[in-house]
Amino acid sequence: MDLIAFANTFPRVWLLALLLLGLIIGSFLNVVIYRLPLMLERSWRQEARFHLGLPAGRPLARYDLCWPPSSCPHCHQRLRMRDNIPLLSWIWLRGRAHCCGGAVSWRYPLIELLSGLSFLLAGLLWQPGLALLGALLCFGIFVALAAIDARTQLLPDVMTLPLLWGGLLFNLADTFVPLEQAVVGAVAGYLSLWLIYWAFRLLSGREALGHGDFKLLAALGAWLGWQALPNLVLIASLTGLTATLLWQRIHRLSMQQPLAFGPWLAVSGAMGLVLNVLGGWSH
């Protein structure tokens, strides 16, 4: 029995498997969201010392996505396996660390839940195959990029560029849109925000967008084609503006405070994938 036949014969089992996979991936995404910016900062500092001719200093302890093992953010005690079960551990421990009782951020279960639900949604919309695999990759990366940009105002090249190339590779087989539309979409996506960036900078002397935003929209264009770009930007702008105004009103923040645009591009990208399979704007 192949995977498509299994999914059609046992749909509940298949969807449950995707939900559990999404929760597990979400747990890993939490590691990426927290550690990747720190890893990049360490790398940038080392490169800066080298280019400035400064001493290298003491060798840094290994720090990557696999090491050291997950630990309590308060007392730094290594987490037990049963304390690291996606979503369930946080609920069971009522948002507290088992080792010291410190509060554990709601961000961790939220990321796991978003990842799990997005995988479940993908299973409802796509049959097992290349399109489903692409959708799962996109949803996972969108969740990670949105969270990283919201925390650090950074969209790492190590995520946006593989997302861009992945869109072109998947569309070699016209998985989401024809390859010609994907290539034009990648170029147009980058250039559109690049032009807006420079126009605003010349008129106001300030920067309204980051270069990571250019690359993320280029990646969305590579997955969904150039025809989707106006709607992607419109959705990202409207949702971002609405959420920003509400957030600033609630927390009484200054309108001059810079805010991330990447999370809203990620939201629009996820909506674009869904509308694409439902016969939306890309056709």
From Swiss-Prot:
The chain crosses the membrane at residues 13-33, 106-126, 128-148, 153-173, 176-196, 216-236, 259-279. It comes from the Bacteria. The keyword Metal-binding does not apply. The keyword Oxidoreductase does not apply. It is found in: Cell inner membrane. GO terms for cellular component: plasma membrane. GO terms for biological process: methylation; signal peptide processing. It is a multi-pass membrane protein. Belongs to the peptidase A24 family. This is Prepilin leader peptidase/N-methyltransferase. It comes from Dickeya chrysanthemi.
